[in-house]
């Protein structure tokens, strides 16, 4: 599948910060915003794939995104990444909180350490990144925050209790922040992807059989990929959704 061709003129020259942008869904979003003419920075812990993405996007658009290497489990690193993005881009009007890791772990195997690790990777940094970026958006007169959740917490999946908890928590966080930041013209929405097939998912978890089972549950009988999330994210980031906040948009091919 190729990236959607729709253009959102208001995104041109807009400062955009994407977390977890070095691969998978995040990389598709970084590329898409760059194609819209936005000024893009992204955070990732993995340097090799991130630098390769910068080269690819620069070759395609003539402008390389700014890569910030950081471990988002560290709150000070989150704050430093936000400050670096603002300094590099001049402003951040769009924040996409995408970084996550869906490790599998049985109920009996969960420890205090693994529980805290999952919430740190999948929930905590979203709040602190919003906290760091919001003052910049307030000074600019507004902005859009897009938080990536998942339909996983709606599926009764037995092997991801901590991950499901984090992804459910993102919905509560989104609604709370929308209420707090709305008076400052900052919109906060969430996207809940379904089974998005990425290279990492294929390598670690998915089989042809599991993909087929999920497609059977979907109304749309095809495999969903990262590019399927580009259009919805661009829409929420742009002024086309100017009256939309505190909402959770499910992109799952019709499971729900």
UniProtKB/Swiss-Prot annotation:
Active-site annotation: 163
EC number: 1.1.1.-
Protein residues bound to substrate: 150
Disruption phenotype: Cells lacking this gene fail to grow on galactose as sole carbon source.
GO molecular function, one term: oxidoreductase activity
Keywords assigned by UniProt, alphabetized: NAD, Oxidoreductase
UniProt key word Oxidoreductase: yes
Pfam family membership, one: adh_short_C2
SUPFAM superfamilies in the cross-refs: NAD(P)-binding Rossmann-fold domains
Binding site for NAD(+): 20-23, 71-72, 98, 163-167, 196
First-tier enzyme category under EC: oxidoreductase
Keyword flag Oxidoreductase: yes
Similarity comment: family membership: Belongs to the short-chain dehydrogenases/reductases (SDR) family.
Reported function: Involved in the degradation of galactose via the DeLey-Doudoroff pathway. Catalyzes the oxidation of galactose in the presence of NAD(+). Uses NAD(+) as a hydrogen acceptor more efficiently than NADP(+).
This protein's name: Probable galactose dehydrogenase GalD
């Amino acid at each position: 599948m190729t990236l959607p061709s729709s253009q959102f003129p208001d995104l041109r020259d807009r400062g955009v910060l994407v977390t977890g942008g070095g691969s998978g869904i995040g990389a598709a979003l970084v590329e898409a915003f760059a194609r819209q003419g936005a000024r893009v920075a992204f955070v990732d812990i993995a340097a090799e794939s991130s630098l390769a993405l910068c080269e690819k996007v620069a070759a395609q658009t003539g402008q390389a995104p700014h890569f910030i290497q950081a471990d988002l489990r560290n709150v000070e690193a989150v704050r430093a990444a936000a400050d670096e993005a603002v300094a590099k881009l001049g402003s951040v009007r769009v924040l996409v909180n995408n970084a996550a890791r869906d490790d599998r772990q049985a109920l009996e195997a969960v420890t205090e350490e693994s529980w805290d690790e999952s919430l740190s990777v999948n929930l905590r940094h979203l709040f602190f990144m919003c906290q760091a970026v919001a003052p910049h958006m307030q000074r600019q007169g507004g902005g859009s925050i897009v938080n990536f959740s998942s339909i996983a917490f709606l599926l009764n999946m037995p092997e991801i209790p901590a991950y499901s908890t984090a992804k459910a928590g993102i919905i509560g966080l989104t609604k709370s922040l929308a209420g707090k930041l709305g008076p400052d013209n900052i919109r906060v929405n969430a996207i809940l992807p379904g089974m998005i097939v990425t290279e990492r998912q294929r390598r670690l978890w998915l089989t042809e059989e599991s993909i087929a089972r999920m497609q059977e549950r979907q109304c749309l009988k095809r495999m969903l990929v990262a590019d399927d999330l580009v259009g919805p994210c661009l829409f929420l980031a742009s002024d086309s959704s100017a009256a939309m906040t505190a909402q959770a948009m499910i992109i799952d091919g019709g499971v729900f």
